[in-house]
């Protein structure tokens, strides 16, 4: 009798076109929306499933009464018509395609994905699989243009998606990071764009599925909480055993010594000196290093003891420039590392620390620059079971929005990713050859001489790259070759092509505020102004900012300016564009909140 009833419900549902209301859900085309029967604290009120294809199901969840209208910046329009079956069994809504099943509990909202042999591919945790917290953008993060931000855009939701994961599962993806980690199972990673960091909200599993979440916010993989200062995670003791802080010893290149207490190691950023908002709201960073101490050529040691509140493998994050070594409990846990002072890096490591034991710690730092950076923080301890879950956190979004992509193998999963994000153009064959690039070539003569030398030496080069600063010193953003160094760009391009080479050029979304292109973009409201207000000058000594690449009109104007000055002007002789500085980065090594402003 139950089987007959289920088949009858399925048949009725399959006959539906749009707008059908069933007992627990509403169906409109390929969308099925469920108003949850049990609203949990911090949980969603509605969940919407979209069958994109046989192997792709989209999951949206909101804590609001309805879903907001939004246009994705990463998902291309999906016009495929997937065939699928919908049925209800008790509290469960079941969607079956030709490749998989998705089962959602209409009471709790928990979703489980299966293959057609009833093997679990992925399932959300039963309680807390989808959680929300209201989020309002702090005024200082909206910066000088706060008056232009509509009230509705100041408010959204922080959300976390949490899934069970078996011990033998591995995760790969998240973009390109300097973490020296491949399998991200049990690891933490902050997702944002930076000079040496490319973040992609997508992972694949060795269980042959992938998850792509549609969020452009600051995100965290793994631990959803920020790392703690050492004094928030441990009891600290100085090198003599006195409780409260570590001992910091600073010795400059002349042997002059400063010894002081350190309750945290957090010298990770610098503040723009003329920034009113920085001076009012942030007194941290490298300004808390000893006043008047010359870092370059110095040696710094932080030492003492930490006492942990519980036994755990503690996950640390080291932020460093210059030379760095760390010992914990007498063991070298971070062998010597180096990073150029103007562009620090993060390095993650974990080590066991016993509860209630004064464990020695020693941090050795050689700053190797007039300005340099150092920080050591630690994640609050979590159980191994918690670490091994698949956890995604997004700081601010209108809703939770992710795509589950199934496949028989990882190639099929990547194919699903390409279905969602659009097919990548196939590069011409010459791009598969060797590319030659320097920090920059400084003249057309450099370009032509180097290309000829490669040919004379029979070294196969297909592409030579012109990096930054081919413009006049004070004209960043002009997209114009400086005539004194590039007297005839057309002849340079023709020469490279005559040697059967190709030419690639770096173009930046950055403009000095004195150039014509800046003024044209600014007249339409398409330039960011915080760096201008704060009078930030780059390392060459000039003031500038970045344009608003989120505006369709701004992007069209940006391309027109490139086209007029570099492409059409030189008979389409430029073969490839290096769209540099996708961060954007108005100044190196500022705190996260200021980068947002």
List each language-model region with its residue ranges.
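Extracellular and analogous surface-interaction loops
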Residues: 51, 204, 293-296, 301-314, ...
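A low-complexity, Ser/Thr/Gly/Pro-enriched, surface-exposed linker/loop concept
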Residues: 25, 29, 48-93, 133
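Solvent-exposed beta-strand/loop surfaces of large extracellular or lumenal domains
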Residues: 69-85, 288, 328-349, 529-534
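Catalytic and substrate-binding clefts that recognize carbohydrates or anionic sugar/phosphate headgroups
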Residues: 88-241, 255, 314-318, 323, ...
């Amino acid at each position: 009798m139950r089987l007959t009833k289920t088949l009858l419900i399925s048949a009725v549902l399959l006959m539906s076109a749009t707008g059908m209301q069933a007992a627990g859900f509403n169906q409109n085309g390929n969308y099925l929306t469920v108003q949850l029967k049990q609203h949990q604290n911090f949980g969603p009120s509605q969940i919407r499933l979209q069958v994109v294809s046989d192997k792709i199901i989209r999951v949206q969840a909101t804590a609001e009464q309805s879903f907001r209208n939004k246009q994705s910046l990463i998902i291309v329009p999906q016009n495929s018509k997937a065939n699928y079956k919908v049925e209800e069994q008790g509290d469960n809504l079941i969607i079956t395609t030709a490749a998989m099943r998705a089962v959602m509990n209409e009471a709790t909202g928990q979703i489980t994905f299966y293959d057609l042999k009833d093997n679990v591919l992925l399932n959300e945790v039963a309680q807390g699989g989808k959680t929300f917290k209201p989020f309002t953008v702090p005024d200082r993060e909206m910066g000088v243009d706060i008056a232009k931000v509509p009230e509705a855009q100041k408010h959204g939701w922080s959300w976390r998606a949490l899934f069970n994961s078996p011990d033998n599962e591995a995760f790969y993806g998240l973009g390109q990071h300097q973490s020296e980690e491949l399998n991200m199972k049990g690891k933490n990673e902050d997702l944002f764009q930076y000079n040496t960091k490319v973040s992609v909200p997508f992972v694949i599993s060795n269980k042959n599925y992938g998850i792509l979440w549609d969020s452009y916010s600051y995100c965290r993989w793994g631990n959803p909480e920020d790392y703690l200062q050492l004094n928030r995670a441990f009891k600290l003791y100085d090198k003599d055993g006195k409780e409260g802080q570590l001992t910091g010893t600073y010795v400059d290149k002349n042997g002059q010594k400063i010894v002081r207490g350190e309750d945290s190691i957090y010298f990770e950023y610098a503040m723009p000196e003329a920034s009113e908002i920085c001076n009012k709201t942030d007194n941290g960073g490298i300004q808390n290093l000893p006043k008047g101490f010359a870092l370059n050529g110095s040696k710094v040691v932080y030492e003492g003891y930490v006492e942990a509140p519980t036994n755990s493998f503690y996950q640390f994050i080291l932020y460093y420039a210059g030379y760095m070594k760390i010992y914990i409990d007498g063991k070298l846990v971070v062998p010597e590392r180096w990073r150029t002072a103007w562009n620090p890096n993060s390095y993650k490591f974990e080590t066991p620390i016993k509860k209630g034991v004064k464990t020695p710690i020693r941090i050795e730092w050689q700053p190797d620059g007039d300005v340099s950076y150092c920080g050591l923080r630690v994640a609050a301890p979590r159980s191994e079971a918690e670490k091994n879950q698949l956890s995604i956190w997004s700081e601010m979004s209108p809703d939770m929005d992710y795509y589950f992509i199934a496949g028989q193998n990882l190639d099929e999963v990547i194919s699903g990713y390409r279905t969602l994000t659009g097919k990548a153009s196939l590069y011409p064959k010459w791009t598969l050859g060797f590319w030659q690039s320097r920090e920059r070539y400084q003249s057309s003569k450099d370009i032509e001489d180097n290309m000829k030398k490669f040919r004379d030496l029979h070294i196969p080069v297909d592409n030579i790259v012109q990096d930054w600063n081919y413009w006049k010193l004070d004209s960043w953003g002009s997209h114009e070759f400086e005539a004194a160094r590039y007297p005839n760009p057309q002849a340079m391009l023709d020469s490279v092509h005559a040697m059967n080479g190709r030419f690639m050029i770096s173009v930046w979304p950055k403009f000095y505020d004195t150039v014509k292109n800046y003024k044209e973009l600014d007249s339409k409201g398409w330039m960011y102004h915080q760096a201008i207000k704060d009078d930030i000058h780059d390392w060459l000594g000039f003031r500038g900012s970045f344009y608003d690449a989120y505006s369709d009109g701004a992007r069209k104007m940006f391309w027109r300016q490139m086209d007029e000055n570099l492409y059409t002007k030189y008979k389409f002789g430029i073969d490839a564009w290096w769209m540099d500085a996708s961060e954007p980065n108005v100044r190196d090594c500022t705190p996260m909140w200021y980068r947002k402003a």
